Amino acid sequence: MNRRNLMSRGLLAALAFAAPITPVFAQQPDLSRKAVVDDPVAPKRAGKTYDVTVVEFFDYNCPYCRRMEPVLNALLRSDPRVRIVYRDWPIFGPASREASRAAVASQWQGRHAAFHGALLTSPARLDSAGIKAAAARAKIDWPRLERDLRTHGVEIDALLARTDGIARAIGFNGTPALIVGSQVVAGAVDLPTLRRLVAEARNKPAAR
């Protein structure tokens, strides 16, 4: 049974699990933790200081990614020492890729957080018109965004390719997926579970 069938049956939440990621890095010599958590082009949100990083692999047209967004926002509000790294993994088709490219480009005008939230709260499955409507809600300067897409397009496409390679190397088969410290989480989780994983990572400095 594939992931999309599970999603259609509403069973995905029951399949969320956590497993150590350390063996994955050991088995993939070309994959480093730094490459996953510190990509210079991947958008990030963090306070002035942080000691735990949560990496999210997501697709803007994934319904369970939309459910994860308020959970991650609540975590950031309640824990200023957490950093979120957003790894766009547009696996739901061309519109998802278009949304990801636009969202990543919006960071050059300092509007990624607003645009990211607007895309994930869009009332319908995203298409080109829906992406532009979300940009308007997020107060995106659209001509500037188009310029940034031209200027940084190669960087953005390279980021998406790196993220796809990392996700496949780890063994993810769908979105959302998280890395919290040294734990891989496949599927959506609730806030108490996410807080527990952050606390566990905080107690293991080498895995932050």
Predicted regions and their residues:
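Sec-exported extracytoplasmic/periplasmic mature domains
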Residues: 67, 73, 77, 81, ...
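Soluble non-cytosolic domains of exported or imported proteins
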Residues: 63-66, 93-97, 106-110, 125, ...
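Short, flexible active-site loop motifs that bind/organize anionic cofactors or intermediates
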Residues: 16, 55, 102-105, 121, ...
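Extracytoplasmic thiol/disulfide redox context detector
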Residues: 2-93, 154-169, 174, 203-208
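C-terminal cap of thioredoxin/glutaredoxin-like
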Residues: 5, 137-208
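Structural microenvironment flanking redox-active thiols in thiol-disulfide oxidoreductases
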Residues: 78-108, 112-135
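Solvent-exposed, polar/charged alpha-helical surfaces in well-ordered, non-transmembrane soluble domains
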Residues: 70, 74, 100, 113, ...
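Active-site-proximal beta-strand/loop segments in catalytic clefts of secreted hydrolases
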Residues: 57-58, 87-90, 119-120, 181, ...
